Amino acid sequence: MNKEERAKRQSKIRNFSIIAHIDHGKSTLADRILEKTNALTQREMKAQLLDSMDLERERGITIKLNAVQLNYKAKDGEEYILHLIDTPGHVDFTYEVSRSLAACEGAILVVDAAQGIEAQTLANVYLALDNNLEILPVINKIDLPSADPERVRQEVEDVIGLDASEAVLASAKAGIGIEEILEQIVEKVPAPTGDSEEPLQCMIFDSLYDPYRGVIAYIRVVNGTVKVGDKVRMMATGKEFEVTEVGVFTPKTTQRDELTVGDVGFLAASIKNVGDTRVGDTITHAKRPAAEPLAGYRKLNPMVFCGLYPIDSARYNDLRDALEKLELNDSALEFEPETSQALGFGFRCGFLGLLHMEIIQERIEREFKIDLITTAPSVIYKVFLTNGEDMIVDNPSNMPDPQIIDRVEEPFVKAAIMVPNDYVGAVMEICQGKRGTFIDMQYLDETRVTLTYEIPLSEIVYDFFDQLKSNTKGYASFDYELIGYKPSKLVKMDILLNSEQVDALSFIVHRDSAYDRGKVIVEKLKELIPRQQFEVPIQATIGNKVVARSTIKAMRKNVLAKCYGGDISRKRKLLDKQKEGKKRMKSVGSVEVPQEAFMAVLKMDDN
């Protein structure tokens, strides 16, 4: 293509994404748009087409990003090229949403006509506004009996401050309003700005590992043109590669000769390691590099940590392979080997949040058929010592001795919880139980309230979301952002079995709730650990102080069975001999902790 052709093509490109809260009908709308633009034959169409992982279909959530190029003949008779970039809606994947929004010029905001605006909708709208996107509100599911589009339209104007007078009323399921949405995209979303003659700048917004072609980077070209055979450089890592293929997704991968300004597609360059294509990095030409990378990218830091151990310790290497393969597609996952006396060899893994952690665990169990034990999730603590040094602790067993600790700081989050009026009391109670500090309360309309709390991340990691959902009958929605570290009275609690510490059961807890947690765990273990030949004390300790104790009684043989009547001194002798033996056993005996005891303690809730 020459310069004029490229410029004409560029004026016809529209890049947009769809943002919505979970379950407001985003993936269905994407399906309808694909149908309307004839991207697929009827035979190839299936529900949630862009959600390619089984797990995504099953949970009905979008985890990885997907991008599609669609051709649309608008009412003005012109052919337009639309790029739809699908985004995940869950709070753990906020960074992935921000990347895919940065690759667009416009966003369709889908709001459920019955439920109205939810917490995550707001969070994503703010991300879109930060990226200066043109936002087109769409009120979806208007065919529901409980739909109230006018109220929702008012809510969009009041809560977000968008003009919703031209909001499209649609039903993705019934296919109503799809054409209006496409027309609005063509009219209102600006064409990409950029110059095809400038040095190349492409933004990576996702990457995928293909066993035959290496890493395939999903890219949006901002300036310049990239062709097969070009030598390109990744600006963050400085690695250089030769491009082997470029192309676009028409959901299927379709090869092209070149990608130019405004194109959204893929690039393969026999890259072996996904760490070389960081999400959010800028690709440029090695010979004629861009002056600076595109703004807005950062390396993701995991927030939540836990240990993953294979139940069958022989499968340690399989687990490593599984984690390495998942890491190829998931730049936010981190792991390092770790050993535990109780659980053997395993890995300490870092995740973006709880959903991310659950998904990784589930994918390992599903795709790689490895049964896992997971230790309790923990966050990163900052520990300041009395000698003026400070250290970072992400694993309770690395916590130093309480005598030398000056103070401990933990990460806090600002949580915005949207909830119907009737449940405000229940939500406040949960937040206070989780050491939350009340900040603010705002009424969205007559029926719904937003509560803002500051809560320690470690409390949210534990079963906050489950409690919130079960106490509000599933109506509450919740979004959080980190606000930094604050000092807290935190202590490390160890569990001793027969005076020996079980490292996998150590955890960090707030001093006020230490006694209760210790007591519950000790009782739980007493039920689950089988009786031994000698008595086994179970103790919960903080430093050298025992806060809770329980004893598993010994099993004993009746040594007096042979003595019918007879002298007391004879019985005494046999009993003393037995006692002596038990004592000796106790000093050398070790106690096996069964698998289910670990599981039970780790799954235990605060109740």
UniProtKB/Swiss-Prot annotation:
Domain tr-type G: 11-193
Topology of this chain in the membrane: Peripheral membrane protein
InterPro entries, per database record: EF-4 (IPR006297), EFG_III/V (IPR035647), EFG_V-like (IPR000640), EFTu-like_2 (IPR004161), G_TR_CS (IPR031157), LepA_C_sf (IPR038363), LepA_CTD (IPR013842), LepA_IV (IPR035654)
Subcellular location field: Cell membrane
One GO biological process term: positive regulation of translation
EC class: hydrolase
Pfam family of the protein (one): EFG_C
Function of the molecule: Required for accurate and efficient protein synthesis under certain stress conditions. May act as a fidelity factor of the translation reaction, by catalyzing a one-codon backward translocation of tRNAs on improperly translocated ribosomes. Back-translocation proceeds from a post-translocation (POST) complex to a pre-translocation (PRE) complex, thus giving elongation factor G a second chance to translocate the tRNAs correctly. Binds to ribosomes in a GTP-dependent manner.
Protein family membership: Belongs to the TRAFAC class translation factor GTPase superfamily. Classic translation factor GTPase family. LepA subfamily.
NCBIfam families linked to this entry: lepA, small_GTP
Name of this chain's protein: Elongation factor 4
Organism: Bacillus thuringiensis (strain Al Hakam)
Species classification: Bacteria, Bacillati, Bacillota, Bacilli, Bacillales
Gene symbol of the encoding locus: lepA
